[in-house]
Regions:
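Short clusters of hydrophobic/aromatic residues that line enzyme substrate/ligand-binding pockets
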Residues: 8, 55, 96
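Polyanionic/metal-chelating signatures
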Residues: 72-199
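Solvent-exposed, charged interface segments at domain starts and junctions
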Residues: 6-10, 27-36, 136-143, 153-156
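Metal-associated gating/positioning segment near the N- to mid-region
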Residues: 23-88
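A short, polar/charged loop/turn motif at coil->beta-strand junctions and beta-hairpin connectors
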Residues: 14-15, 49, 189-191
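Solvent-exposed, flexible loop/coil residues
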Residues: 12, 16, 32, 55, ...
Length: 199
């Protein structure tokens, strides 16, 4: 009913206006959920810096991507759209319900738990492959670890700066600069954003 299974039974008496489909030889399942997808996206890596927690996948969803139509035909109904794996700390995710012909905004599942993409290992070390790209940091697993630690430490410093400002007189002090990168990392620390880690 309205696109949702309403009853499963051997002896169902459908209402008069129901459309009957002969299911003999067919497989019926609930909608498939893809927990790691790049559907409806292009250029999913922001490679300009190692930490890009301020970028948001929901800002670049392409509702005209033919993959949406094809995946719906295959039974996929929901996808967790993730940033690429070129950064130790990548961008913010978006969970969508695949709706062919809909807008990007209408596909976003607003009450989904907020997430962010992290990555370890070879993708991060060599996101720009080849000998000509040996200048990008990090180049080792030690560097990946250091970048992640630095990101969280910077976010905590940012929080402390704002805490001091909030406790101050405020009349004689300029407020700290807003930092979207640190704010996303603080959401992780506060349990408001979960990490999806490619490793």
């Amino acid at each position: 009913k309205d696109g949702i299974f309403s009853k499963i039974s051997k002896d169902i008496r459908p209402p008069k206006n129901a459309i009957l489909i002969n299911g003999r030889g067919k497989h019926i399942t609930a909608g498939i959920i893809d927990c790691h997808s790049h559907t409806a996206l292009s250029a999913v890596n922001e490679g300009s810096q190692a930490i890009t927690s301020e970028v948001r996948i929901k800002d670049v969803i392409n509702p005209y991507d033919i993959a949406i139509y094809r995946e719906l035909a295959g039974g996929l109904t929901t996808a967790n759209l993730l940033h690429g794996s070129a950064n130790p700390i990548g961008g913010q995710n978006a969970v969508i319900k695949l709706r062919w012909g809909s807008t990007a905004e209408d596909m976003i599942v607003e009450d989904a738990i907020e997430g962010i993409k992290f990555a370890l290992g070879e993708n991060v070390k060599q996101s720009n492959w080849g000998d000509d790209y040996d200048y990008r940091y990090p180049q080792t697993r030690m560097g990946v670890d250091q970048i992640i630690r630095q990101g969280f430490n910077s976010a905590l410093d940012y929080k402390n700066t704002w805490d001091k400002y909030e406790k101050s007189d405020k009349k004689t002090i300029i407020p700290p600069r807003k930092d979207l990168e640190s704010e996303a990392l603080l959401e992780i620390i506060n349990g408001e954003r979960i990490i999806h880690c490619h490793s």
